[in-house]
Amino acid sequence: MIPVALYGVDAALCERFFEALPKLVNDAYEDRSYIEALYAVEADHSIEHVRIADQWSNRDPYAWPEDIVNEVEMVLRTTVYPDVALLEHLMTLDGVDAQRISEWMHFSTNLFPIYSEKACKTLQAMGLDTPYRPDDIASYGLYVSRIEGLKLHAPAAGLPEIGLPRTRMLQLGLERFE
């Protein structure tokens, strides 16, 4: 049964995606910078996760006053997967958009997917209206629900068990699928 988050999906294309997925991501463990960043994250240092994510994505490091740092840390700690509503407040910070927030949340939780324009285009091709709008946290929320739907719908052999977050495998697979 197809999850509600995948309502309208081209079922044949979705099945073809899952058949191809293991080969599409078989080199995921070769991305040393991603793996080093992923395993550099420590449980109770959520503001450090922001630095790690920014470094991994080659972004300029943040330079916020202490009150903003505390606010960001509070939002990161209180946001519960898959809800992205609390993250909207972070979009008011200079240089922060849904793409950047998704990277922070991915490295902080290993649950949230990294927002990707290529992945959104593949989801669109599968019949799932999933716009890529980095200036709109709701569009990221829709992307999160689509990825969660794919996780729920994945056949046993569709998601390789290679020790990396399933959301990362799906994101990479969607980016590489043709």
Residues of each region from the PLM?
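Short helix-capping/linker segments at secondary-structure and domain boundaries
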Residues: Y62, F112, F177-E178
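Small-residue hinge/turn detector
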Residues: D97-A98
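C-terminal accessory module of base-excision DNA glycosylases/AP lyases that mediates lesion recognition
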Residues: M1-V50, D54, S116-E178
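Catalytic Zn2+-binding segment of zinc metalloproteases
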Residues: H106-E117
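Helix-hairpin-helix/helix-loop-helix acidic hairpins
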Residues: E48-D94
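Cytochrome P450 catalytic-core helices
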Residues: E103
